[in-house]
């Protein structure tokens, strides 16, 4: 059973066992399901991959709760005075981690395809740990507020670099270690840890403020906020250290091993073996050694006998960028990359525009006002907690339980439409709707963002692309998404001061509804094996298996 453990270092002596688990092993593992129907193997995978997303979310969104403290401490916002925190600097600090994300997602995604999942996984966590220590080590000797913000910006950029690496690597590793019928559920569980990270940020802030209540609220010693924000950010080191060693010692993905050991093809598609086997043309390879990695039911998962020793029916290796360029030079592949990237970009403009500025928005709608700075901070943290409990976390778990029933495409489409509708309601009635009404709209928008595109934009690149380009394609999609987050971070405070909150909500609405068109380009990936489709294209030509019938436009994607 060690072969079922993704973290085991044991190696089978049997050549077949080196390729894949047997039918008996899979059947045995699937009968021992525990919490949420997970096997022990899946539970470990969810823990180590999910803990990374818990940390990612905590680190990305804690700045939303720390920013008001920066206003009070460094920008003259104490004693009821209006802070002089420039909107450009404010936006830059908020965007720092997302800017780093872009570079991290592309860099680690490419390295994951080029060097292997094992070589890369865990290195991103080392970057996160180093960056977190440097952020909270902000020297008090830096004399100016601008200098302090530049220190924080620099190291939160590095933090974002590490966090960005976690997106493509965790998605790819989870996708490649999952049965087809469980893949969407497992990917959704991993991504749902983002909700717990956001929830934890609000809870930690409330606890820390309560611990500092006497000096802050009763004695007005607001210099103690230095300790509060450093603890808020520094506590992220706990999950980072817990998952570091398991990630560094994780075995290589079987799918990646197969893709690297695959046959190479010449320009005329002649088969070239990795050993001394004679060359054969594609048709002979298909006839003699055709394999099938997926079936229509769970009772027939991949077995060792499907592979054989020659590995003849697998896709070509991708040891350089030529394979990536060749794959996406075809429109029916490129449109999927275009759709995953642009829909993620449009989503993140609205999603991060709200989440990175949630405390500011709560203050604008009148929820987080208080009689002094302490009460304002506490009310802001409580508002974030309510939104996380009522909308953020439940949305993720609706996706977990329904993704294999409704499919990815339906969840993404309905989430985009309803979230856009909430922004339209806010935009059209911003000056007339009550505080409670605004708050309810934001809660509903958060729910359908997460029972919708925020989860599925993460799932799609992990499922729609084959293993040989999966890491890079996921990294590029996520990176363009983070460009949307950066845009929102940099422009939100400026735009709200120029055109008002209502018009900004119209922009968010347009982004959500605009993403609907790009979603229609995508196929439904439920029970879809991208590697099998890729093999059929390489060995036989054509577009691989597609859905036929009146709903083909939906299941295959338009154009």
From Swiss-Prot:
The cellular location(s) given in this protein's UniProt record come to: Membrane
Task: Pull the Cytoplasmic topological domain ranges from the record.
Answer: 1-45, 116-118, 166-188, 246-335, 403-409, 460-474, 519-559
Membrane spanning segments where? 46-66, 95-115, 119-139, 145-165, 189-209, 225-245, 336-356, 382-402, 410-430, 439-459, 475-495, 498-518
PROSITE patterns, sorted: MFS, SUGAR_TRANSPORT_1, SUGAR_TRANSPORT_2
The main location is membrane
Membrane topology value:
Multi-pass membrane protein
Q: Which residues lie on this side of the membrane: Extracellular?
A: 67-94, 140-144, 210-224, 357-381, 431-438, 496-497
Location of the region described as Disordered in the Swiss-Prot/TrEMBL record: 1-22, 290-316
Post-translational modification Phosphoserine, affected residues: 297, 299
| Alphabetic keyword roster | Membrane, Phosphate transport, Phosphoprotein, Transmembrane, Transmembrane helix, Transport
Write out the GO MF terms: phosphate transmembrane transporter activity
An example GO BP is: phosphate ion transmembrane transport
Could you give one GO CC term from the UniProt record? cell periphery
Tell me yes or no: is Endoplasmic reticulum among this UniProt entry's keywords: no
PANTHER family, sorted: SOLUTE CARRIER FAMILY 22 MEMBER
Q: Per the similarity annotation, which family is this?
A: Belongs to the major facilitator superfamily. Sugar transporter (TC 2.A.1.1) family.
Q: What does this protein do?
A: High-affinity transporter for external inorganic phosphate.
- Protein's recorded name: Putative inorganic phosphate transporter C23D3.12
Taxonomic lineage of this organism?
A: Eukaryota, Fungi, Dikarya, Ascomycota, Taphrinomycotina
């Amino acid at each position: 059973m060690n072969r079922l453990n993704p973290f085991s270092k044991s190696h089978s002596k049997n050549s077949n066992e080196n390729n894949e688990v047997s039918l008996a092993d899979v059947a045995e593992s699937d009968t021992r399901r525990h919490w949420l129907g997970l096997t022990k193997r899946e539970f470990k995978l969810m823990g180590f991959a999910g803990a990374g997303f818990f940390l990612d979310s905590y680190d990305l969104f804690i700045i939303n709760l720390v920013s008001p403290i920066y206003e009070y401490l460094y920008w003259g916002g104490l004693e009821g005075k209006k802070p002089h925190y420039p909107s450009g600097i404010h936006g830059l600090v908020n965007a720092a981690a997302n800017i780093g994300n872009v570079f991290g997602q592309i860099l680690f995604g490419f390295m994951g395809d080029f060097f292997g999942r094992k070589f890369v996984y865990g290195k991103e966590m080392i970057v996160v740990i180093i960056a977190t220590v440097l952020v909270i080590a902000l020297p008090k000797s830096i004399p100016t507020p601008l200098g302090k913000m530049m220190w924080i910006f620099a190291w939160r950029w590095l933090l974002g670099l590490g966090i960005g690496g976690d997106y493509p690597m965790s998605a790819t590793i989870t996708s490649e270690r999952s049965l087809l019928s469980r893949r969407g559920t497992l990917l959704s569980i991993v991504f749902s840890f983002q909700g717990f990270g956001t929830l934890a940020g609000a809870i930690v802030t409330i606890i820390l403020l309560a611990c500092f209540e006497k000096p802050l609220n009763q004695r007005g010693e607001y210099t103690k906020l230095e300790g509060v924000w450093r603890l808020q950010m520094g506590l992220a080191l706990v999950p980072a250290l817990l998952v570091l060693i398991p990630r560094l010692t994780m075995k290589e993905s079987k799918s990646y091993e197969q893709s690297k050991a695959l046959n190479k093809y010449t320009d005329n598609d002649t088969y070239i073996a990795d050993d001394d086997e004679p060359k054969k043309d594609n048709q002979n390879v298909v006839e003699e050694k055709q394999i099938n990695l997926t079936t229509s039911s769970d009772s027939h998962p991949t077995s060792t006998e499907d592979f054989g020793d020659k590995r003849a029916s697998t896709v070509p290796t991708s040891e350089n960028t030529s394979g990536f360029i060749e794959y996406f030079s075809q429109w029916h592949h490129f449109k999927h990359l275009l759709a995953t990237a642009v829909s993620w970009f449009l989503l993140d403009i609205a999603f991060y525009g709200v989440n990175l500025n949630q405390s500011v928005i709560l203050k604008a709608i009148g929820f987080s006002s208080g009689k002094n700075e302490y009460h304002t901070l506490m009310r802001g943290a409580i508002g974030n907690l309510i939104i996380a409990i009522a909308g953020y976390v439940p949305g993720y778990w609706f996706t977990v339980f329904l993704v294999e029933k409704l499919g990815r495409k339906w969840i993404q489409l309905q989430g985009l439409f309803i979230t856009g509708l909430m922004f339209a309601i806010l935009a059209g009635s911003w000056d007339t709707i009550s505080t409670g009404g605004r708050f309810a709209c934001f809660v509903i928008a958060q729910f359908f963002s997460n029972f919708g595109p925020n989860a599925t934009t993460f799932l799609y690149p992990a499922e729609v692309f084959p293993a040989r380009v999966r890491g890079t394609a996921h990294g590029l999609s996520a990176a363009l998404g983070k460009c949307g987050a950066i845009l929102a971070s940099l422009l939100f405070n400026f735009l709200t001061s120029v055109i008002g909150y209502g018009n900004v909500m119209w922009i968010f609405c347009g982004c959500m509804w605009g993403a609907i068109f790009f979603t229609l380009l995508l196929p439904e990936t439920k029970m879809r094996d991208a590697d099998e489709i890729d093999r059929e294209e390489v060995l036989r030509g054509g577009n691989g298996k597609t859905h036929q019938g009146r709903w083909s436009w939906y299941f295959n994607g338009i154009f």
